[in-house]
């Protein structure tokens, strides 16, 4: 600590009265103490921040597949799973596993819906889990949009476990954009093995040529597979027309063009490719899906030859 005689701008003058010198010294000491106190507070804040960063880094290392999808929000305990696979926590909150499309009482085979609920209950009930809260925090019904991670399980992510067992499929959402690639790969394995919902016609992939199947699923979340026969370009949208000629149209916002190209799916080269598209099916003016997220489009089978028509920019 600097003493008053050592402080810049402070000096003793013999001509000053003693009471003046004492007042100056008290003022200087208080200023110096204030500076030291502020420096100490800054150091404490820096240490707290570094500790928080270290804790966050430890969680990221422990749960690497979740790091891009959300933030750790503490340990919780699940005490119930309802028929829609919402998870009830001991603290009273309800958790919706974000980015998933799962069976429910009004959709899908009842035995598969029950198996999914039993699977989730066996995995979670009576155990502590790490709550990974996704962007947005809660939905319009007050449910916490999150994932639950079990450090001693494989996979640690409950959402990934459901996908791998075939009890859910990926439903692209803004909150899960960071881990969409990993989730789609896990889903692909369950679909190839025909697990769970992939045996159920209500959840199975619909071929673009199946007009009757498309009509029955109007207004619902679907996964469609088909070859792109033409790409149409407009000012704000792109139109991917799937075979046959009266097949589904995939409407893509032009703002996604760069993101699709960066992820290896340039729109101009999709003609002749077999793609898999997921989203809400609108059949009012012919079957169509509006694409709002790059993860809604996958290349199912890649070929080098062009399709029936070339894109018209």
Tell me the role of every PLM-derived stretch.
Residues 1, 24-25, 31, 43, ...:
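Short hydrophobic transmembrane-like helices used for membrane targeting/insertion
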Residues 48-58:
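Sec-dependent N-terminal signal peptides
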């Amino acid at each position: 600590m600097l003493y008053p005689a050592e402080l810049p701008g402070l000096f003793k003058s013999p001509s000053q009265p003693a009471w003046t010198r004492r007042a100056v010294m008290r003022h200087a000491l208080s200023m110096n103490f204030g500076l030291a106190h502020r420096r100490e507070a800054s150091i404490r804040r820096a240490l707290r921040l570094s500790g928080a960063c270290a804790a966050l880094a430890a969680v990221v290392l422990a749960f690497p597949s979740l790091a891009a999808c959300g933030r750790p929000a503490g340990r919780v305990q699940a005490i119930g799973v309802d028929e829609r696979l919402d998870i009830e926590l001991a603290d009273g909150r309800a958790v919706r596993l974000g980015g998933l499309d799962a069976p429910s009482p009004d959709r899908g085979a009842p035995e598969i819906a029950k198996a999914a609920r039993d699977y989730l209950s066996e995995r979670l009930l009576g155990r502590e889990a790490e709550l990974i809260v996704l962007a947005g925090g809660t939905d319009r019904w007050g449910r916490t949009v999150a994932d639950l991670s079990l450090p001693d399980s494989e996979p640690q992510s409950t959402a990934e476990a459901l996908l791998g067992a075939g009890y859910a499929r990926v439903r692209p959402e803004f909150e899960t954009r960071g881990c969409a690639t990993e989730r789609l790969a896990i889903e692909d394995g369950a679909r190839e093995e025909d697990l769970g919902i992939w045996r159920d016609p209500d959840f199975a992939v619909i071929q673009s040529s199946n007009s009757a199947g498309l009509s029955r699923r109007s207004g619902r979340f679907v996964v469609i597979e088909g070859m792109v026969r033409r790409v149409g370009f407009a000012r704000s949208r792109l139109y991917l027309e799937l075979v046959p000629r009266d097949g589904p149209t995939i409407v893509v916002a032009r703002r996604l063009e760069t993101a699709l190209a960066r992820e290896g799916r340039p729109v101009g080269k999709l003609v002749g490719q077999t793609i898999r598209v997921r989203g809400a099916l609108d059949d009012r003016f012919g079957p169509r899906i509006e694409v709002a997220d790059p993860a809604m489009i996958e290349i199912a089978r890649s070929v080098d030859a062009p399709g029936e028509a070339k894109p018209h920019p």
